[in-house]
């Protein structure tokens, strides 16, 4: 196993910062070999099966092409949950967890209706439904592929979310597709806007 770890580090050291290489090593060994970081020392002399070595080689080659590790492995962690991801959806971002946490803190134990616009992988909608037991969560996306992924993620995490395919930029259609009175609207599109002021009700 020590040789495999050295191979990963040597292959990636010119492409990624040292801290990221270390994170990639931990993630690859955990997902491919089921070896956690605190077991590395005890398993250092373990001979990995050829199937695992081949899988690791494929992963490293894709990483050398700067493909995101989440797409390579097919999953991403978000707010202590695991989500399926592929190129049809964006990879959940760490800063999105802050948005989700704020909504959870503000609405704990409330019977509310939440709309997630542009749900993508469903990470926001599924996580909110997981933690806000009394809430009803509706998630929309214009992409049928993204909604299919989001539905699988809801099932994967044992949650019930209402998924609707609609174009939120078409107000008349969106109003017909989402005939609900809403309490909270959330969205985290692939860009961010820094709003002035400390008390910002726009999430």
Question: Which residues are covered by each model-predicted region?
Answer:
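S-adenosylmethionine
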Residues: 135, 140-203
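Short, glycine- and charge-enriched coil/turn segments that flank and shape catalytic ligand pockets
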Residues: 49-55, 105-113, 134, 171-179
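N-terminal auxiliary segments of SAM/dcSAM-dependent transferases
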Residues: 1-73
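Glycine-centered helix-boundary capping/hinge motifs
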Residues: 33-34, 66, 80, 158, ...
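Generic hydrophobic alpha-helical segments
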Residues: 8, 99-103, 171-172
